[in-house]
A protein has these predicted regions:
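RNase III-family endoribonuclease catalytic core
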Residues: 2-123
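Short, intrinsically disordered, charge-balanced linker/junction segments flanking boundaries
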Residues: 126-129
């Protein structure tokens, strides 16, 4: 069995009155969210980027380019599920995902398990920490 590890990073500008999505869940009490072509879920996007890199299948921009209207306003979970399908079609299996969020807000501690469950569900049950 071949095991590969990928690293992904994603950055979006914060904008007031834009809904915050992080880790495939909504954060309705946040005053600002990440703007972008899709839902701006930087955690889901960085995870997609890492998985694509590990499998040698390109990067987030190649697979979900902003010129493709199919991905306009797409959720982080939709992107993760599509990446899972791409990986599976190319003979790859996700063993686990480990991700870090570097931000002052939102405070994810109380919703960590919810994020892990939502992302794991989008990735076909692969463990997420």
């Amino acid at each position: 069995m071949t095991i590969r590890i990928g690293t992904g990073v994603d950055v979006h500008p914060l904008e007031v009155n834009v809904p915050m999505h992080l880790g495939c869940i909504a954060w309705p009490n946040e005053p600002a969210g990440c703007s972008g072509h899709s839902d701006g879920d930087v955690l889901a996007h960085a995870t997609c980027d890492a998985l694509l890199a590990a499998a040698g299948l390109g990067d987030l921009g190649e697979v979900f380019g902003t010129a493709d209207p199919q991905w306009a306003n797409a959720s982080g979970s939709a992107l993760l599920t599509h990446v899972l399908q791409l990986l599976s079609a190319n003979g790859w299996k996700i063993i686990n995902v480990s991700a870090q969020v570097i931000a002052n807000s939102p405070k994810i501690g109380t919703r960590r398990a919810e994020i892990q469950q939502a992302m794991s569900s989008a990735l076909g049950g692969a463990p997420v920490s």
